[in-house]
Amino acid sequence: MASLQQSRIQSYLEKNKIGPLFEEMMTKLITETPDHPIPFLIGHLQTKQESPGRIQRTLSGSAALWAEGSSEYKGTRRDSRGYEKPWQIHPKKPKKSKSDLAVSNISPPSPESKSLPRSILRPTWDWRTKPESRGFDELNHILLESKKLGKALENLSRSIAVSDDFDLDPRAYNSVLRPRVVGEWVGREEEDLDPLAAEMFQPPVPRAKTEGWTSKDNSPVGSLKMETKGKGLKQQQQNHKKLLAAMLSQDSFDSMPDSAPSVTEDEMEDEDDAMELLEDLDDLRMEGVTGLLQSGSKFSQGRSSYYTEPQAKVTLNICSRCARLQGDSLTARTEEEPERHVPEQAVPEVPCPLPTVTETLTATEDLQTASQVTGLRHPVWASDVKPIRGTSPQTARRALQLQDSLFSKELENMGKHLAEVEKDLAKLAEQGKLNRSPNSPHRSLLLPPLFHTTNTLPVLGQTSRPQSPSSLSSKTTGLPLHNPKPTSLMTDRTSPSNSSSRAQTPSRPITPNSLMMRSFTAAGHGNKERVYGRSRSRPVTPTGQITRPILTPPGLSTTDLYGGLWSTLTEDEFYQQLQAVRKPWRIPSDAESDCLDPPEQDKCEFYTSDPSHSLKTL
């Protein structure tokens, strides 16, 4: 009995396709998830009732499997039914497990993604329903979308109706004359002369929500509607309107000063344009524009930030200008301080006394030497290290340290040169003592290669190039030279004369380079008198030269040279000349000229004690 009833129910379900129908309804509910499921299912069933026989087109995968299983279970009645079973025409699919079936029930694919391939895979479908089924699926989805839009419009109309329920008073609002701005002007009375005064102390929540329920909305219709509304919908609409009001009034109302004048509604309508005009002031400031005019800010009553911000910019500019002026004064002081201290540091006092020399120069020689060596002296390294304008005191301190290091290097170089000169002079002194004996072999070797007659004397106009400074006296000073080429020694042997007569000395200032132009007089060493003239085109500077000073010209040894000089001078005069040579010389900077004295013409002066044999060649 139970089996017969069960078979009858099964046949009824198969005949009316109840199983696939419920499967499809569950699939629709899961995929669409409507807010109101019962009206959604009613609408879905109405669409099925309008088009009978098409339920098999939108079967889900699980419904198709269930239909196949039920058809196999009831295979005995397959031949007795005459209607078509299209889900059995297609070959069987592999059966799914219960977990796969549950997953397919929970998250099935979209209906259009299943229906279109199934229509393609069934070429034997009825020709009357095949084209209509595809169009019906598309139309069905269009209808569903339209229903969604209709629901959204319905919700919007409800929210508008709620706000309109409080506008039953004809004085409250006129939607034709004024545009509706949610959160700003809804429910505002026209007698309110200062509509923004109350909004300064609280966010601009629509007054229809606060005041309308208590004082304005006393009509029974409005109160009845408000009572029928659910609290959830009212809370949602209120929150939404609060958010809109805060967004709309953030720029124009939050930063308004308390003492703002009353604004008419015409001015408020023009306020948006004024905001548009003043919107790009911040952009202009970011681009570096400083002279912004504040005349246009009177159109915007709610932009108080524009009043204070340019003032802050102006004070910053003034402060930066003052800082620049103070920085200039500080750097000027730092420039003056190194210039004050550099001349004291730059003049080196290098005492170079000979161990055995006790005599000093005469007063005139000392004055001339001092005027040449230290009289015209400038700071040596002032051109190398200059303070940069606008630098910090740390930079000036570094510049002073650099000057000290350069000064110490120059002193080291001078000390090296002076040590070499001292060595050479010590050797010369020993050789001079040996050559003082009359039987010394060096005296006979000196005169033939050194001295020429006046017939072989070169004249400046006849020489192909100016005479280089590597002459006799410049070799004895121990200075490094520019050009080590040998030049002819312009000396002459003069006739015998009175031994007490003095040769004329040139009237040139005494420098370390020109000291040897002074005449060497012989007192008590025979009746011969030799005057050495020196030719030079320009003076010799010790900077930028070769490291090892060339003390003697090629082909001439210092022993021979000073042996000849020692034979004509007394010991005291010889040491006096050496002491004059040992005076410190000037070290010019790289930027200065390498000439200490103005270039003069080469002079060769030859004097004798006899006026008849006097010869002067220019």
Curated annotation (Swiss-Prot):
InterPro entries: DUF5586 (IPR040687). CDD domains: DD_VEST1 (cd22980). Residues 74-84, 333-343 have a biased composition (Basic and acidic residues). Residues 70-118, 330-352, 456-552, 587-618 are annotated as: Disordered. Residues 463-481 have a biased composition (Low complexity). Residues 485-516, 609-618 have a biased composition (Polar residues). PANTHER family: RIKEN CDNA A830018L16 GENE (PTHR32000:SF3), SIMILAR TO HYPOTHETICAL PROTEIN (PTHR32000). This is Uncharacterized protein C8orf34 homolog. It comes from Danio rerio.
